[in-house]
Swiss-Prot record:
The protein's assembly and partners: Heterodimer composed of ERCC1 and ERCC4/XPF. Interacts with SLX4/BTBD12; this interaction is direct and links the ERCC1-ERCC4/XPF complex to SLX4, which may coordinate the action of the structure-specific endonuclease during DNA repair.
Listed name of the protein: DNA repair endonuclease XPF
Modified residues (N6-acetyllysine): K289
Species whose genome carries this gene: Cricetulus griseus
Localization in the cell: Nucleus; Chromosome
Amino acid sequence: MDRGISAVRKAMAPLLEYERQLVLELLDSDGLVVCARGLGADRLLYHFLRLHCHPACLVLVLNTQPAEEEYFINQLKIEGVEHLPRRVTNEITSNSRYEVYTQGGIIFATSRILVVDFLTDRIPSDLITGILVYRAHRIIESCQEAFILRLFRQKNKRGFIKAFTDNAVAFDTGFCHVERVMRNLFVRKLYLWPRFHVAVNSFLEQHKPEVVEIHVSMTPAMLSIQTAILDILNACLKELKCHNPSLEVEDLSLENALGKPFDKTIRHYLDPLWHQLGAKTKSLVQDLKILRTLLQYLSQYDCVTFLNLLESLRATEKVFGQNSGWLFLDASTSMFVNARARVYRVPDVKLNKKAKMSESAEGQETKKELVLESNPKWEALSEVLKEIEAENKESEALGGPGQVLICASDDRTCCQLRDYLTAGAEAFLLRLYRKTFEKDSKAEEVWVNLRKGDGPKRTMKSDKRPKDTKNKERASTKKGAPKRKKRELTLTQVMGTAEEPPEEGAAEEDQQRQATSSPEGCGGEIQHEAFDLNLSSDSAYGILKEPLTIIHPLVGCSDPYALTRVLHEVEPRYVVLYDAELTFVRQLEIYRASRPGKPLRVYFLIYGGSTEEQRYLTALRKEKEAFEKLIREKASMVVPEEREGRDETNLDLARGTVSTDAPADTRKAGGQEHNGTQPSIVVDMREFRSELPSLIHRRGIDIEPVTLEVGDYILTPELCVERKSVSDLIGSLNSGRLYSQCLAMSRYYRRPVLLIEFDAGKPFSLAPRGSFFQEMSSSDVSSKLTLLTLHFPRLRLLWCPSPHATAELFEELKQNKPQPDAATAMAITADSETLPESDKYNPGPQDFVLKMPGINAKNCHSLMNHVKNIAELASLSQERLTSILGHAGNAKQLYDFLHTAYADVVSGGRVRK
């Protein structure tokens, strides 16, 4: 019973020796900590949270996710901390947030809320003890977190700033990236802790786990497919270089193409000119993505799933683009032939008759013989589990059987492993084949009959090695009796179900459903919740006395700490890494070092000489090179004394853009500086999700955050700005929302402005490349903008290439202009009856008149200047309307509309019918 309770309520392990050394250095001086992936950046952050969980402190935490905040709070609760961290969200009203801050402790708050509270002085800046920043590599100049840190340093010179990140590769891009991040963080010290650090390496080597590397050989068909995909990938890369010579040749190597960040690298180079690229280049980028997916499916999933993906890609030609030619390469033919050979084979007699290749598909399917090649890793996993089971039978010296944790890359792989361990490879693949290719029922019968035959006949019918057949038999034999005896201890725990073992029919239906279900079916979060549920009853605690096997995904869980929880709650003695993942490998090293004296064996399954192995080694190499570059930058880095901003000498804290080279106007008071009112802009609360308010504040303009119904930025009492990104602009034009917004701005402000802001790093073009049509189209963005400006003559369009340019433009528009009033801006709503004095028309009748035939935005004001109300309008003659509107056709339409009898309209409609 005690053992079960300790498994559930397991606190985070104490700091290791090198971690304590780093904490002492960080306590002595603020700085940025860059450690290797998996070496415990979250553990360091948790320790500082633990130190400041006291009402006498007020510490803000930036850049954390809700799941991470929940994990930290639960860990502190387990340790018995009384003053737990609190989360400030939109559910807490703005008036009550000041009380939350003054109660002290740790505060998790969104960046938007903190920015608004700093600007409105709702947070006691002078009482803040310090700020902890997580994922510090994301702190660029224009982001919200950098804005918060700048506001904090302007108002508080004593508080600490400590930043943590485990992504050293992120600092490998751009010029002096780490120095710019430290500048935005206001820290002087850089703490680098790679895996090859002397203190880290020496300590972990003393407590390293027992590692068993198993290099699994791919089948000949898999090797042929991998070679074919790599050849096609290399050909596509060469063609991409030919079409785009400006691309970096080093980044477009075949080795980099195997890594996870390759898609981001390609888009980083091509996004700024994406709208200028031809169809061939865009098609090649899509092909590279598909080929990388094929490589992943080859090593990750079974032969049926891989063939299904290939066939679906060939059937859907639009996936490859119009000009893709790699489908006609010899390597592509080899890939399709070998992929089909892994699933089924056609008798040689059939293949030799080339004249009959045009027969119907049904005739071919009747003579297919299923092969259903098993994944080699499955058999290796069965051997590992068999070895663990044998050791557990003789584990009295170690205190009983050890628990087993199997880690695969994603939920889908976990589901397949569970079904394989439940039913065996043959039954699982046959069931999956039936579900995927339902029309091949006759081929299934042939395969089933072959399996019922004798052993030699099976060997001759299949091209696989006899060793593979024996391994399959061993795997199915191994899973025979123990599978039934320990079903509750393995499979139900894997899927997180606390039900009775189902009957055979129900179990088969469930396995069929899970085999091809969506990845959400085996989520780590569901598994963990069910694991806690199983431990909640007294009878369930006894489960831990028997070998427990859990299959868990490495990535893709909604809870990023689900695997960490399972690791510390189950405390497995054996961990099987079905897929290689650098972060979790390091996490296992920390786990072993924090439990001295307790055995841990790690089985490392990997395809030898495969792209999977190459990806893992490339990730190791890139991280090592990134740390070496950071070490060189740190050695040559020049950090000014005022970097931390603890006095007024730091220029980064200065606001305004007045240059010493700017000429003074000597006609006004001899060039003396004019001490006028401080410029300000009223900003809508929702705009604080963007980086523009930060840049406006940086230019010396005060920001008043309020909730606006009309406009996003009020620059002057007469000038209102509605900001739109390109995607938002297109969506608002299509939905008609932009028309309503422009109507409201035109009605209540003399100078309405539509600001279209596009990112310089993203593609944007109003007209397609090489084509421009004179005729207007209802679906064209340019046409819709033209109609918008025709309908609202006072509306002005501003085009800005970046938020920095927008902030500069706002500053120029505000020069020598009166400041807006926040209360007045808040009082203006879309349904407000109060109008500026310059507008002398009621909006209701004006909208009504605009909907009449013959009335448009050009002649509407002329008509309203001559007519007081609708009754007077109805009394005018057609000649008088012609003189007012200036157009006989419009006057006739309006006159007929006003004076035609309803009965005539109805009768006329019947005649037309």
